[in-house]
């Protein structure tokens, strides 16, 4: 469940509580931004695997910044996405005044307006694997995304809440990839 208790009653998320208190709110992950961990801070859905619905809920959530992967759940099938309802959430977000960054955009934010960054169709690459690509094809690192969020959220005098997840370490662990786990862990020092 995302944003529900075991009896399927909606519950306020941590992100919603921070917004109600007047804080700025951001989410950064190297997984899909619609994946269970980041989604539990803004979404309300009984099925954590229904990432099409979760993506649509991100557009409606009171969020200042969301950076990660998962572009496929924001685009319709005819645009090489996974959305079967035909909605193009990238365009919808832009129509609402949200700045949307995609794969080759440089993550930067001055803290003004709303920013969504979708830097990969699914999860961002493992840190170990990403180093083998030419620089022009590499995903932004978790450290770059974190600095972007911190630079923008810390502007002004309002407090902020930032959920920062290095979720690829979990994926490497599920795959019994010791080198991947170590590489992901070492990147936290950045």
Show which residues each predicted segment covers:
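Surface-exposed loop and adjacent secondary-structure segments within mature catalytic domains
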Residues: 1-7, 11, 15-145
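Active-site His/acidic residue clusters
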Residues: 36-41, 122-134, 149, 157-190
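Alpha-helix C-cap/termination motif
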Residues: 61, 155-156
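An active-site-proximal beta-strand-loop segment
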Residues: 152
């Amino acid at each position: 469940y995302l944003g529900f208790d075991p009896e399927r009653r909606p519950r306020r998320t941590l992100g919603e509580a921070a917004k109600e208190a007047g804080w700025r709110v951001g989410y950064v992950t190297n997984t899909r931004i619609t994946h269970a961990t980041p989604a539990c801070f803004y979404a309300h859905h009984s099925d954590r695997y229904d990432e099409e619905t979760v993506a649509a809920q991100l557009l409606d959530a009171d969020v200042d910044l969301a950076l990660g992967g998962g572009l496929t759940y924001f685009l319709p099938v005819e645009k090489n996405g996974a959305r079967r309802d035909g909605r193009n959430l990238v365009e919808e977000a832009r129509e609402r005044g949200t700045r949307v960054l995609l794969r080759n955009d440089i993550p930067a934010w001055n803290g003004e307006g709303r920013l969504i960054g979708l830097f990969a169709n699914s999860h961002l690459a493992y840190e170990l694997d990403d180093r083998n690509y030419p620089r022009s094809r590499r995903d932004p690192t978790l450290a770059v995304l974190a600095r972007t969020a911190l630079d923008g959220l810390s502007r002004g005098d309002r407090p902020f809440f930032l959920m920062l997840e290095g979720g690829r370490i979990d994926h490497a662990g599920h795959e019994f990839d010791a080198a991947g786990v170590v590489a992901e862990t070492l990147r936290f020092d950045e």
